[in-house]
Amino acid sequence: MSTAQSPIQTDVQHVPAKTTKSIKLVDEAQAKTNLLGMTQAQLADYFKSIGEKPFRSTQVIKWIYQQGVTDFEQMTNLSKSLRDKLSANACVIPPKVIHRQYSDDGTRKWVFEVTGGSLVETVLIPADDSKLNGRKTLCVSSQVGCALDCSFCSTGKQGFERDLTAAEILGQLWVANASYMTDENDSLENVDHSLWENNVTNVVMMGMGEPLLNYRPVVSSMELMLSDHAYGLSKRRVTLSTSGVVPKMYELAQELDVALAISLHAPNDELRNELVPINKKYPLEQLMAAARNYVFDVNPRHKKHVTIEYVMLDGVNDSNEHAEQLVALLGNLPSKINLIPFNPFPHANYDKSSNNRIHAFSNILSEAGFVCTIRQTRGDDIDAACGQLVGQVADRTRRSAAWQQSIKDRENS
């Protein structure tokens, strides 16, 4: 696993001049460096750049992520002079929550306004099975919109605007944990940090956007999710889902050992070209080779599997023949297959497969020796179910031609 660190990419914030109980805000005209989302190595470099000892990075990271503290004045094991210096030059500011909804089934959704006024969403899904010991899974967004244009996904219909910064990605997790320290309608500024507890147990990079097309900020965020000084999640509890950006799959395999999920949705190239257009660039043979490399070649003694995500579309990809093709495609790849009932959205050209059809499809996979689950739809009453993360924004079907043309350069950078 590579330990190379990227240069510091500071997230400069302009925030209003008022100070609150737990989140210190600064003058609009004064740009400050947001420390949220910096890895320990990046933060150590930042401290060296301001003439401080790099070990301070560990102290500050623990305050931010283990105690939820964003006001430097409350970081009591830092010297007064350092606290003053940080207050003058830095900040810890998660993205602004402009809307939140709590579903009847316990699902929570937040709409964030990020720099520039764009909106993104994140969803927290609590397990409803007592055997799962209170598991709470956060579905995190990595981009504003998505450029991949999967034909069955409502999120893609708003087009792509920009990548999220590491602060905007990791801030989603910070806010989700903070929500358990406040009442439903209370401000995050009223968090009692003495009661802080990191309630989120699992993170899936499955929200808005393709994570591997925003590679460095996503990897930096996941490093902090795994760090014992920050959130301390185990590798099997952090999952990155990709539609198949093959070069970045190889890069990730060398750098960060997290769980991998593949948004497959079709067992042959002809159908996947229609449903998941990136398949035209990286067809199934290349995708499966990258998946096998991730499981077998990097650390063959470490038992891993790939999660295969497969949305069930009535009369499109749900026949017995499709199931048999999927069995042949996966072969000996250690896989857990997650069948996802389609969640309809306005002007969708697809329907949900019947329950009988989904179960028949599942039975073929199970009989072939694969672990196969059928995802329970959660949060659909607040438009938080899979494929519904479209945000409360205008439909942006006219995608950025410049972005589309730059994908190749970004993948190979």
Curated annotation (Swiss-Prot):
Enzyme Commission designation: 2.1.1.192
Principal location listed in the UniProt entry: cytoplasm
SUPFAM superfamilies registered for this protein in UniProt: Radical SAM enzymes
Binding site for [4Fe-4S] cluster: C146, C150, C153
Requisite cofactors: [4Fe-4S] cluster
GO (cellular component) term, any one: cytoplasm
Taxonomic superkingdom: Bacteria
UniProt: S-adenosyl-L-methionine binding residues: G209, E210, S241, S263, L264, H265, N343
Cofactor binding summary note: Binds 1 [4Fe-4S] cluster. The cluster is coordinated with 3 cysteines and an exchangeable S-adenosyl-L-methionine.
Chain ranges of the Radical SAM core domain: 132-381
Classification via InterPro entries: Aldolase_TIM, Methyltransferase_A, RlmN_N, RNA_MTrfase_RlmN, rRNA_lsu_MTrfase_RlmN/Cfr, rSAM
Annotated family: Belongs to the radical SAM superfamily. RlmN family.
Protein name: Dual-specificity RNA methyltransferase RlmN
Organism, scientific name: Psychrobacter cryohalolentis (strain ATCC BAA-1226 / DSM 17306 / VKM B-2378 / K5)
